[in-house]
């Protein structure tokens, strides 16, 4: 795929209801889809079905109207970063070196659809000729192993910032961005609800690295992984909608993944609907909602772009940071 007439503009203006002093440009879906700029559809319905998560309704229309414009925006930013790198090398009088990977962060609540967003971006960005090597790593692999979480008394805080090996995550992204030939990321099993001992995903000098996780936009007094992002996406929705999606997903997992051999949550597999819903709601209210309110939602303001979903799990509005 190649960008045609990249410097041209469609003349689409953000929603007039957005005040001029807002740090974001606000687009409804109709306005945002115009920024696709005649990009061809590169996915099939079969591919979209394979990429979407449990309970999501994403289809070819959603890809065309939301994700193709987003992939075009990121493509243009990658090209601009490559030009900046070339300008720096010209200034230094050095020969072109291994390009610095463009790093994208994808954040949002559990059950909001951030994993699907990350997978879609990976596939769409791979279709551009100028950056075909796109790797995706989730921060789940950087959760402390179950035994360590138990030792620290953090099992009930799993998914909260303190349950991650932040140093290892920062070191991983730093090594990738520094051009290291091979960098390994730990692998996490949702079935076992733990890291897989001795298993790693190897990243080899990608053009683009996507880092997806609950708390990837966190800041702190020292260098954080978010400081290394070139672009970031926050997948947003009303809290009550996310709660419903979480419960619906729990019920589907009860009938599928929880029944697999060795599943950590196998004790939920034979629960009736009323009991399952009560358990899911308790898990949401005691763990996932506090994490969203205290740690995840406050990082939304740091995102380069916010995808706002409606109750049907489809994107309704897009907010793009302008400063």
UniProtKB/Swiss-Prot annotation:
Cell compartment(s), UniProt: Cytoplasm
Binding site for ATP: 108-115
Compositional bias segments (type: Polar residues): 1-12
Single GO biological process annotation from the record: coenzyme A biosynthetic process
Span list, region Disordered: 1-24
Involved pathway(s): Cofactor biosynthesis; coenzyme A biosynthesis; CoA from (R)-pantothenate: step 1/5
Matching SUPFAM superfamilies: P-loop containing nucleoside triphosphate hydrolases (SSF52540)
GO MF terms held by the record: ATP binding; pantothenate kinase activity
Top EC class, one word: transferase
InterPro entries on file: P-loop_NTPase, PanK, PRK/URK
UniProt-listed Enzyme Commission number(s): 2.7.1.33
CDD domains: PanK
Origin superkingdom: Bacteria
Catalytic activity of the protein: (R)-pantothenate + ATP = (R)-4'-phosphopantothenate + ADP + H(+)
GO cellular component, one term: cytoplasm
Keyword vocabulary terms for this entry: ATP-binding, Coenzyme A biosynthesis, Cytoplasm, Kinase, Nucleotide-binding, Transferase
Principal subcellular localization: cytoplasm
Family, similarity comment: Belongs to the prokaryotic pantothenate kinase family.
Alphabetical list of PANTHER family matching this protein: URIDINE KINASE
Designated name of the protein: Pantothenate kinase
The organism of origin for this protein: Corynebacterium glutamicum (strain R)
